[in-house]
Amino acid sequence: MHFKKTLLLFLLFACVGITAEIFFTAIYDAVKQHGTPHFSLKFQGQSYIWMFPIYGCISFMGPILVDRIHSWNIFLRALIYAVVIFSFEFLSGWLLEVFTGSCPWKYREGLHIAGYIRLDYAVAWMGFGLMVEQIYLFASKVLDHFHAHHP
């Protein structure tokens, strides 16, 4: 069951991450364009093919991190999740640039570090981390329950 559970969680978090990113970029673009002569009510976001496996890797963090800290203070957990996300975002962006020649999200605005992470996204990453924590706890419980009744 461990392999099946990990695979299902990988697919779940890949889809959740891609969906969240598309919503975030659509909202960001709509807000950024507000007030310009070309303002549109189009809700059009974007993501990259590389993000599917990157977001899927969240499934490996559940047993390592979430299971250990989910009962801690919410602010401490949010901070830890943001630091982990920033670290993974920096590493994956750097690796993509090294191996493919470009980082698809290379930041040029805001408080960025080498273009790989934006510190001004910390609150968004804190919220995303807490959301992922709850999804992981729920999905893990459902999968464990299902496996217990359907071995």
Q: What residues fall within each predicted segment?
A:
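Aromatic-rich, lipid-facing transmembrane alpha helices and their immediate juxtamembrane interface loops
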Residues: M1-P151
